[in-house]
């Protein structure tokens, strides 16, 4: 795909006529292509390159060191090639996941909430580069969500009310070169959250599936449905050409849920290339305690409790990880039931 629509975001979203028009254009681009690009400025480019450089340096470290950057409290940290599973098959990137970085003194960590804890950073340079980059991505995420709300003729803070102290996180990826027996990077899937903003180097390997009229898409948030592996070998899949000076943006499962399918979560997969490839996928997310709800069916009782949804998705992807074992052993899921009850009470006003 060489003709992705590319947009320039305003420095501030106020709700003016130009913002509303841009919001409509973003929605139309997603509905047509499933993805679009946003222009980046020189400062954003610098922070992108610093994060990529830190990732490359980390990936050169010995496996014994990288494998020590894990935690039984949080899914932050190193994921070895082949550890992650999509549709029952291993994926092959090396990944460093950066979730919310919470000290052991944080009340949520002390209470034993699942997925909460400090990031097992490999070094200070890596920590600074990734946090700085994520802060920049977060600013773009807030503007994109405000524009999306305006495009749907909704109050400007419809989505950003959910993202206060959001569970924003990032997957920092290195894909190995393909071999005569290995070409799969990551299997076909949709992303579980609200909004995905991605950066990649010049190698290329990302493929997305645009909306297809009449095609049934599984609702990844339902226990009996999964988008993993769907349409993996069925066209159309379109190659996302690496382009300097842009980030790519596409919707996740929660945007599909909240908009009643007016926006579809974009299926994507990665094929290995002849050279190693580096990329970052940032997820701009609701608060861990928040519940998402259908925007255009106010009578619908269905909710997605974000903390439960995130925990379920990561436990499914990493069934053998020390974090998953700890959640099960220490019955940390019980805390989610209490959080859900509180969230439901706030949502209904009772």
From Swiss-Prot:
- Matches recorded under InterPro entries: DIOX_N, IPNS-like_FE2OG_OXY, IPNS-like_sf, Iron_ascorbate_oxido_reductase, Oxoglu/Fe-dep_dioxygenase_dom
Q: Which domain of life is it from?
A: Bacteria
Q: Please state what class of enzyme this protein is.
A: oxidoreductase
What gene does the UniProt entry assign to this protein?
efe
Q: Which family does it belong to?
A: Belongs to the iron/ascorbate-dependent oxidoreductase family.
- Give the Fe2OG dioxygenase domain ranges: 166-286
Question: What residues bind Fe cation, as annotated?
Answer: 189, 268
The protein's annotated pathway: Alkene biosynthesis; ethylene biosynthesis via 2-oxoglutarate
Q: What is this protein called?
A: 2-oxoglutarate-dependent ethylene/succinate-forming enzyme
EC number(s) per UniProt?
Answer: 1.13.12.19, 1.14.20.7
PANTHER family per UniProt? 2-OXOGLUTARATE (2OG) AND FE(II)-DEPENDENT OXYGENASE SUPERFAMILY PROTEIN-RELATED
Other notes: A dual-circuit mechanism has been proposed in P.syringae pv phaseolicola for the complete reaction, in which the binding of L-arginine and 2-oxoglutarate in a Schiff-base structure generates a common intermediate for the two reactions. Encoded on an unnamed plasmid.
Its BP terms in the Gene Ontology are: ethylene biosynthetic process
User: What's this chain's function?
Assistant: Simultaneously catalyzes two reactions, namely formation of ethylene and of succinate from 2-oxoglutarate.
Query: Oligomeric state and partners?
Result: Monomer.
Catalyzed reaction equations: 2-oxoglutarate + O2 + 2 H(+) = ethene + 3 CO2 + H2O; L-arginine + 2-oxoglutarate + O2 = guanidine + L-glutamate 5-semialdehyde + succinate + CO2
Q: Which GO terms describe its molecular function?
A: 2-oxoglutarate oxygenase/decarboxylase (ethylene-forming) activity; dioxygenase activity; metal ion binding
Q: Which PROSITE patterns match?
A: FE2OG_OXY (PS51471)
Q: Which cofactor does it need?
A: Fe(2+)
Q: Which UniProt keywords apply?
A: Dioxygenase, Ethylene biosynthesis, Iron, Metal-binding, Oxidoreductase, Plasmid
């Amino acid at each position: 795909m060489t003709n992705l629509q590319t947009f320039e975001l305003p420095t501030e979203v106020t709700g003016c006529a130009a913002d509303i028009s841009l919001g409509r254009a973003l929605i139309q681009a997603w509905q047509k292509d499933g993805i679009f690009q946003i222009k980046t400025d020189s400062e954003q480019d610098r922070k992108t390159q610093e994060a990529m450089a830190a990732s490359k340096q980390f990936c050169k470290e010995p496996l014994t060191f990288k494998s020590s950057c894990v935690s039984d409290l949080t899914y932050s940290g190193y994921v070895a090639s082949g550890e992650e599973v999509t549709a029952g098959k291993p994926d092959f990137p090396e990944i460093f996941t950066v979730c919310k970085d919470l000290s052991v003194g944080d009340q949520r960590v002390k209470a034993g909430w699942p997925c909460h804890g400090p990031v097992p950073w490999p070094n200070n340079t890596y920590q600074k580069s990734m946090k700085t980059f994520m802060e920049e991505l977060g600013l773009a995420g807030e503007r994109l969500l405000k524009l999306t709300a305006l495009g749907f003729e909704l109050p400007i803070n419809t989505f950003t009310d959910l993202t206060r102290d959001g569970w924003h996180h990032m997957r920092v990826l290195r894909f190995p070169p393909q071999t005569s027996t290995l070409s799969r990077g990551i299997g076909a899937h949709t992303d579980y959250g609200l909004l995905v903003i991605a950066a990649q180097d010049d190698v290329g390997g990302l493929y997305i599936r645009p909306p297809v009229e009449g095609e049934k898409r599984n609702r990844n948030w339902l226990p009996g449905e999964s988008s993993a592996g769907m349409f993996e070998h069925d066209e159309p899949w379109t190659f996302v050409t690496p382009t300097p000076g842009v980030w790519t943006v596409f919707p996740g499962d929660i945007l599909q849920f909240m908009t009643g399918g007016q926006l579809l979560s974009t299926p994507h997969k990665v094929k290995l290339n002849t050279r190693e490839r580096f990329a970052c996928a940032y997820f701009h997310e609701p608060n861990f305690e928040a519940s998402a709800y259908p925007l255009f069916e106010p009578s619908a009782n269905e909710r997605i409790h974000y903390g439960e949804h995130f925990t379920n998705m990561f436990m499914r992807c990493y069934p053998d990880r020390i974090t998953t074992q700890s959640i099960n052993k220490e019955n940390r899921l019980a805390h989610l039931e209490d959080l859900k009850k509180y969230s439901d009470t706030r949502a209904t006003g009772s």
